[in-house]
Amino acid sequence: MGTESGIRNMTAGSPFRHILMFTLPLLAGNFLQQFYNMVDSWVVGNFVSDGALAAVGVGFPVIFLFTSLFSGIATGGTVVIAQSFGGGRPDRVRSAIDSLYTAFIRSILPITAAALLLVNPLMTVLRVDPAAWAETRTYLLVVCAGLVGSIGYNLNAGILGGMGNSSTTLLFLAVSTILNIFLDLALVLAVPLGVLGVALGTVIAQLCSWLFGIWYINRRYPQLAIHPFNGIFDRKLFCEIIRIGLPSGIQMSLVALGAMGVLSKVNSYGKAFTAGFNVGNKLDTLSFLPVQSLAAAVISFVGQNMGASREDRVRQGVRITVTMAVVWTVLSSAFVVWLSVPLSRIFSPDPAVIAASVRYLQCVMPPYVLFAILFVLNSAMRGAGDSLYPMVNVVASVILLRVPFLYLLANRFGPDAMYWSYGIGWAVACVLSVYHYAAGKWRGKYRSE
């Protein structure tokens, strides 16, 4: 089967073609988002201050912490919807959508309030440079107040992803990105609001993208219509979504805490080092986007085929996806390291910032292929309904290995040595994930009822 109005049935036909065609719109959307992030960093770094650039960089893991729980639940929704669609259960798809949005509407205000209250304590834990404190606080307060748009967008994307539709998600991202860039330029250059303008632009764009997404889905896909305030909540089905999605959300939250632990150490070396770290992080994230897109594709592919009882296609699809991820990561890592100086110079003319960014890339990019394998295999296991093991594996590698080793190496050998901890954590986690997948321990996790 192929596609109908963007909805893709991946239980028959070429796995390579399905995965590739699902990945391409996601990849385009992710590049759009990163293009905005680069424009954002370019505007802030060149027209505001290094303090503002550090503020935006520090803000990312904090915002990720607050959105990660619902992002995980959205992943659980993607898996349940994919399995239900692959198994020919449109009634179950409908119930999953209603249950997801009912839970979202009931919990968004408490989540937002908690985020606002935790801004100052988290900044203290992160040891934000006093020179960047005011700008960081402004950025975080504004973006936390607008979490509804970011979380709502993730829910819409999760619903469509389960149905094999990534092209419509690209449309939503395009709306957000174009509006975000326009607002960035208007509120920073035309109206000099500084980091406040950047934060307002982000919140307004995300909110508009979410609301546009609801309108578009309801108009184009009536069978998936979203009813935020009058959907029927299916407690049993939502528990299945939570079973799959909560470990993923907890994993992302704890990884965000681990990232804040890293930032706490990074921030202790001053504004220039922090800004350089953030520039390097943006560049490595950009090179990793295809793997993230492939991982999202394999979740939907595995979910649909588990629902259709096609485990043979699951294994075939995973092999194809891992191969594509490895080839891309090796090539992109070499390219980014080779051009690390001119790429870093795009974001800041400061030699100290450039030096910190280059060193980050030289240490982190070579072992990235291990993370690519780990990322795809964990996503495949989530698609099969096994999300507890990936959570334990990744959390152990980050919290128990990366962060302690980072502090140990930095204290013993200096700030550049902290980056070696990335490869150590990825190597251990990758070996464990390969073993878990090869042993078939993810099988039997799918529940059709």
What is the meaning of each model-derived region?
Residues 1-23, 81-148, 190-246, 302-367, ...:
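Short alpha-helical transmembrane segments in multi-pass integral membrane proteins
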Residues 35-53, 123-130, 186-193, 253-282, ...:
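Helix-terminus/linker motif at the lipid-water interface of multi-pass membrane proteins
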Residues 65-68, 180-184, 210-214, 286-289, ...:
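Hydrophobic transmembrane alpha-helices of multi-pass small-molecule transporters
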Residues 26, 30, 42, 79, ...:
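Transmembrane alpha-helix boundary and packing residues in multipass membrane permease domains
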Residues 74, 142-161, 169-177, 198-211, ...:
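Short runs within selected transmembrane alpha-helices of multi-pass transporters and secretion channels
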Residues 53-113, 150-169, 263, 277-340, ...:
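Small-residue-rich hydrophobic transmembrane alpha-helices
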Residues 10-47, 61-76, 80, 105-112, ...:
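N-terminal transmembrane alpha-helices
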Residues 21-40, 142, 176, 205-209, ...:
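Transmembrane helical elements of multi-pass membrane transporters/channels
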